Amino acid sequence: MADYTFDGRRLVKKSSGQKLAEVDRDTLRSYNGAVFGQIEGKNLRDSHGKKVAEFNGKEVKDDRGKKVIGIKEIQEVIEGEPGMSLAAMWFFFVKGRHDHAGML
């Protein structure tokens, strides 16, 4: 069962209902409005514009091209439609958290 839900715009933690982040066109913002990253085509860039990952539709790869996670594994942690926005939410807001089953 997924720990988070993503409706295409907002990432919400299921257990508490807390809004963690949102997508505003191609900009990823945390709940307090701070910019965390940007979606640019198939690439994910951090708040400084550095490429940190890419998503080819099936898997997220780091900036060196090494596979980090597949979309199926992301969907086990975040409930939502598969796509670039879901992958970006996982990469920036869920990947490093210790409170979910998808910890890598």
Regions found by a protein language model. Name each.
Residues 1-20, 24-26, 34, 41-42, ...:
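Long terminal segments
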